[in-house]
């Protein structure tokens, strides 16, 4: 990950005054880093601390249940990196993925479906398999041991009604 600093635009910091006025941008032209000296002490401590969402005691009925994956900060960060890769790096490189969907699309689907941890494991496993000696073809993201085809609720599995081995092969 790289940090890009533009030399064409000056830094902008937010000045917080004690008179409770709205925040006003203040341009600092000669500073090379962000400073928080002008902020009150309690605001400095708030900036240093990370806040976490607390789980409500009464869950909202509209909120996702256990089976549904809510996009976390990690998923959003991973998807942002993948979008950057697809937009900036991938067009420069020759096509080399042997699978459908491509490795970057596979990774995006895995992160959306399984979350950060399982998505990272599946992406790593896919990148290890995507080489000239590996396989090729259709390979959707699915967790280990998970079946590839999910039946709808109303459908039943097809029964084998063949009498002979020869009829099965046809």
UniProtKB/Swiss-Prot annotation:
Residues 154-170 have a biased composition (Acidic residues). Belongs to the UPF0161 family. InterPro entries: Membr_insert_effic_factor_YidD. The lineage of its organism: Eukaryota, Viridiplantae, Streptophyta, Embryophyta, Tracheophyta. HAMAP family: UPF0161_YidD. This is UPF0161 protein At3g09310. Residues 49-70, 147-170 are annotated as: Disordered. It comes from the Eukaryota. It comes from Arabidopsis thaliana (Mouse-ear cress).
């Amino acid at each position: 990950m790289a940090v890009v600093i533009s030399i064409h635009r000056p830094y902008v910091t937010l000045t917080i005054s004690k008179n409770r006025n709205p925040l006003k941008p203040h341009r600092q032209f000669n500073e090379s880093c962000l400073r928080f000296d002008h902020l009150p002490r309690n605001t400095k401590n708030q900036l240093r601390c990370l806040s976490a969402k607390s789980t409500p005691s009464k869950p909202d009925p509209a909120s996702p249940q256990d089976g549904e994956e809510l996009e976390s900060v990690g998923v959003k960060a991973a998807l942002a990196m993948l979008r950057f890769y697809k937009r900036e790096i991938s067009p420069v490189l020759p096509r080399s993925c042997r699978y459908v969907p491509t490795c970057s699309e596979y990774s995006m689907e895995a992160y959306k479906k399984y979350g950060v941890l399982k998505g990272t494991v599946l992406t790593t496993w896919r990148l290890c398999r995507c080489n000239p000696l590996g396989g090729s073809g259709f390979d959707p993201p699915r967790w280990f041991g998970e079946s590839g085809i999910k039946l709808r609720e109303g459908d039943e599995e097809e029964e084998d009604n063949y009498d002979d081995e020869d009829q099965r092969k046809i």
